[in-house]
Structures are given as C-alpha cells and as structure tokens.
C-alpha cells in the first residue's frame, strides 16, 4: 500500500503546486497561531491552482467547532485536522459536517491505546510538543489498534522518514519543518527527497508484507486504501 504523504504548513501557492507536482497526496494549511499560519484568502488563492485529486486540509487548534466547519465549507477543504484538546463531543459535531477529520495526539497519550474510527477518520501521532521538529520513539505507536489509520508526524525529515515508516508501519506521514528552507517556505530538494524516501520505504514493506485492509465509509474493507474517506461518493 502506498504511504500517504501529507505536506503541512503550506503558506503560498508556489509551495502548494510544488508539493503536488512532486507527488504529495495532501497539503495542509495551518489556521492556528504558528509561524506557518495562513488566512482564508491565501488558502483560496492556492486552492484555485491545486489539482482536485489532492487532499486539502485545514489545521486548527482549540478553535470553535462552528468556525472550523465554516472555514472548511467556505473554502471547500476536503478535511480538517484538530491539533488541540478538542473534547469528543466537539469532534463528533465537526465530523457530522465535514468530509473527514484528522485528530492529533501526542506520542504516549494513554488515549491512543483505545482510539478508534468513531473518534477520527485518521489519527495523527506527533511529538509531545507539536511543531517542535523533535523526533519521538516511533515504537510508541505500536499499541494503537490496527484498524486505525495512523499518520506519523514529529521531526520527520528526508533522512529519517524511511526508518520511521519501517519501524512504525504507519498509514501515512506528515511533515512541515523537515522540508523547509525557512519557516513557512518549502525547500524543493528536501520536498523531493522526503516524498521519494517515503515511497521507497512503503514499497519495501509492500514487497514483504500484504497491504492491510481498512474500512471504507460503509464499513466494508478496502484493501490497501490510501483515501481518508470513500472518494467515489463525491465523484
């Protein structure tokens, strides 16, 4: 199964186009306070030039649920990523109103051992200090139920993403600072090397292990799916 690759912290249309041209599956726009924070107008301009098949994701942290849904709907984002301490009832409310939700947890969070697809479509596991660029022990994801799609983040770079994939066997990987020339601007060489290294590691695993089946929107198993939701519904 190809490893899903999300490039986060996109702040301009040039980087959005570069990431998609190099083979990224998804790009993320940060609406929460951050060196990579963007406004709706910037995202709208970028989305006009991004191919439809690319997953576009808005990243929020402890934002009002109504605001999350309003921004996602107004811009036509495919999904949202909740990177704060959002309670389950707010997450459920948002999930009823957007296509899919990525929910972030810090590595070692005890909730990861009992997380399930009712809480999020995709679970992102980050370093204890999100955005710090620090690597954590990738073995900490081993206790997550196998039916959960895990998006691995936290200090990933072109130099270590292959080892991270071979160790943690995630559904996908997420990177921001690890492919930057400076905060908010992507480095073309690092982007290319990261995506190539992730694909290579995924291919190596596929060569020796069968692709796991994951549940689609209707609950049926979809072998090797890298789609966060049943894409056919929207076509």
Locate predicted features.
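Conserved N-terminal beta1-alpha1 strand-loop-helix module at the mouth
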Residues: 1-235
